[in-house]
Amino acid sequence: MKTLVILSSILGDRSHSKQLADHLIQRLRQHEPDGSIRVRDLAADPVPYFDGATAGALFTPADQRTAEQAAIVARSDALVAELFDADRIVFAVPVYNFGLPAQLKSYIDQIARAGVTFRYTAQGVPEGLLKNKQVVVLSARGGKAEGTPADTLTPYLAQVLGFVGLVDPVFISAEGMAMGELAAQDGLALARQRIDALVAGAPQQVAA
């Protein structure tokens, strides 16, 4: 399988979400020696914010774009092409102030494109076009919020990923990262166990 791993933490190797991603990558290489893994680090190589210039470029007909607009669209096209090419897409996401990092939001704004990754049917029903992908979200947070109203990350990502066709994401979270060393170790250990089970093929609960 072709796996695309998208990192979004600003902390580099100190990031707990990256540590989970590294663990998953290690397990995948063991279980799928013939597979390929591509990593995109949104902090090391940021995606530009979706601004007026970007919107203008995307909504200008291809034969009328300036050279600058063509470059903007080409950058977005490259991000989208990675998604279509992958069989499995992994998002490593830290929770910042109850939400996702700005880097990941910028990425989502660049790849959620009408007529490209989603469309509306004649009946006005949205249809995601990134189909038949395995989707995994590895998150880490300082406190504990899974299954409570304070967890705003899970419903948002389930909604926006599903909108572009990335349905039934498996969420694996390491919680309690800022609640002391023992709590952090326990949270990471539990998340790694779930990653091991996922790679081994054990059934996983997906977001509702």
Swiss-Prot record:
Q: What is this protein called?
A: FMN-dependent NADH:quinone oxidoreductase
Listed under subunit, the entry gives: Homodimer.
Q: Which family does it belong to?
A: Belongs to the azoreductase type 1 family.
Pfam families registered for this protein in UniProt: Flavodoxin_2 (PF02525)
Cofactor(s) for this UniProt protein:
FMN
A molecular function (GO) held by this record is: electron transfer activity
Gene3D superfamilies per the record?
A: 3.40.50.360
Superkingdom of the source species: Bacteria
Positions contributing to FMN binding: 9, 15-17
State the protein's purpose. Answer: Quinone reductase that provides resistance to thiol-specific stress caused by electrophilic quinones.
Q: What class of enzyme is it?
A: oxidoreductase
Taxonomic lineage: Bacteria, Pseudomonadati, Pseudomonadota, Betaproteobacteria, Burkholderiales
Entry keyword set: Flavoprotein, FMN, NAD, Oxidoreductase
Cofactor stoichiometry and binding remark: Binds 1 FMN per subunit.
Q: Does the keyword Oxidoreductase apply?
A: yes
The record's EC number reads: 1.6.5.-, 1.7.1.17
What is this enzyme's catalytic activity, as reactions? 2 a quinone + NADH + H(+) = 2 a 1,4-benzosemiquinone + NAD(+); N,N-dimethyl-1,4-phenylenediamine + anthranilate + 2 NAD(+) = 2-(4-dimethylaminophenyl)diazenylbenzoate + 2 NADH + 2 H(+)
